[in-house]
Amino acid sequence: AMPGGCTHFSVMLTNYLAGYLRRKAILLEVNGSGDLEKLEHVCTGQVGQKNPFRILDADYYKHVGPEDVKEVLQRGYDDIVIDFGSVKDGENGLYWRCDKKFLVGSFTEWQQESFREFEMEQRAKQKKSWQSLAVFGSEETRREFSRRFRINAERIPFSADAFSVTKECGEFFQRIL
């Protein structure tokens, strides 16, 4: 994903799966952002060595390495959401093994170029196996982007609180999953 929006989307998706669909879900942070540590501090008041930690109905796992992934796979989760961070963090082989892949991008003027570049690069390698989603930008910009570059991206509904699933978000997740 592009910077800005990926972690928020991942938390929203994990909460939809765990809180709304009542599935056993976990979010893994496979990037160096440290966002989940900040989330843990804000939501629980502490930052511990505890991995995974829980907020509401979902589990969160910070600073995930290859060994942690193996461990999580043995824990019987219905859904494992992985936040790979920015495409600039380099390619992660684990990404291509996921059942569902989402590229979270932005239609803000200063970010749409890297969104387009990644799409074109992967398309050239014939690796287009993900759904493109957009966090920021108007519907008009999304349509123009789609028309100009033939990249169809669905707009993620705005949600100020990643932990509460609005009706619009519920319908959105139902559509993309």
Residue ranges and their predicted role:
Residues 167-177:
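Histidine-centered active-site loop/cap adjacent to the catalytic His
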Residues 9, 13:
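Hydrophobic positions on the alpha1 helix immediately C-terminal to the Walker A/P-loop
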Residues 74-168:
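Conserved catalytic-core segment of NTP-binding enzymes
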Residues 1-5, 16, 20-90, 95-97, ...:
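P-loop/Walker-type NTP enzyme "switch/lid" segment
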